[in-house]
């Protein structure tokens, strides 16, 4: 429904403007110029939610890590993203949006957690670099700078060296 999309787009615009006040110029102007949503032009918009009551009061894995259910939803979103890409369908995750507006516009019950608002559609091409890297907003971090072995900030270890070699030989990336 275009009216629903419009209300959600208005939420994006409000949140985007609010977020821009946290950034000083010239970075603010750069932030405001980034394409961070495709709500109106995408073929399909999907609000992905988590229902912590769906499987009853006991859900395996959530007693020690209560957020595990939301993490599982995020993994499902990643799988959807990969499948969309394989089918030449673009997918964007709009995170600059009010969950309260999503709840109101989509009549979500109070216990339902909005996890992601996704925009899917056919695109003319896929960029070789992610948008934020291409625009210079953020650099791509090397795997060795974000993965540690056994201890925080420990970058060396036999298993880690094996993993790095596998990546280098198979993906030409590490």
What is the predicted function of each stretch?
Residues 1-73:
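Glycine/small-residue-rich phosphate/adenosyl-binding loop
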Residues 37-40, 108-110, 139:
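Solvent-exposed alpha-helices and their adjacent loops that cap or buttress functional pockets
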Residues 46, 54-55, 59-105:
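Small-aliphatic-rich amphipathic alpha-helix that forms the alpha element of a beta-alpha
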Residues 50, 96, 122:
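Short secondary-structure boundary segments
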